[in-house]
Amino acid sequence: MDLPGNDFDSNDFDAVDLWGADGAEGWTADPIIGVGSAATPDTGPDLDNAHGQAETDTEQEIALFTVTNPPRTVSVSTLMDGRIDHVELSARVAWMSESQLASEILVIADLARQKAQSAQYAFILDRMSQQVDADEHRVALLRKTVGETWGLPSPEEAAAAEAEVFATRYSDDCPAPDDESDPW
């Protein structure tokens, strides 16, 4: 009787074998760098220093878009695609209820997302405008297309949304932050 075997028992996967004969990892897959040998990054004393500099350069290239509420209790930073990178809270949020804090974080995060996506809109529009030689009619069509096709807010729309939220959500009688004791 001929029983079906396990597909992994054959040598069909030798081309994607990431481990050497001794079982040690032979290759690494880095989403930024790609696939490379695991032995190459740490060979030589100068490469450690160069690797650290490359990480620093990469970190500096990441654009963050931050929105802080007027009372300066919540600050949200997002990446260009609108994903939240981090949220900073002032010590004064201890006086807020959980639902108030959650609501505040969501409102500020949405404004930060719009701000970041408006930068994405401006970047795409700038690159595409270069392709049409800055012809005003074509740029106007591009502006409409970028906004409608990708659903990205323009910088003007993002600024208007922030101004509207700040005007309606926060009154002028909100207490001014104490700059000496405030960590922000």
UniProtKB/Swiss-Prot annotation:
Induction: Transcriptionally activated by EspR. Repressed by the MprB/MprA two-component system, by direct regulation and via EspR. Up-regulated by the PhoP/PhoR two-component system, via EspR. Disruption phenotype: EspD deficiency results in decreased cellular levels of EspA and EspC, but does not affect their transcription. Interacts with EccE1. One of its GO terms (biological process) is protein secretion by the type VII secretion system. Changing residue 27 to R: Absence of EspD secretion. Residues 33-56 are annotated as: Disordered. Its main location: secreted. This is ESX-1 secretion-associated protein EspD. The keyword Secreted applies. Required for ESX-1 function. Required for the maintenance of adequate cellular levels of both EspA and EspC. Facilitates EsxA secretion. Keywords: Secreted, Virulence. Changing residue 138 to A: Absence of EsxA secretion. Decreases EspD stability. It comes from the Bacteria. It is found in: Secreted. GO terms for cellular component: extracellular region; peptidoglycan-based cell wall; plasma membrane.
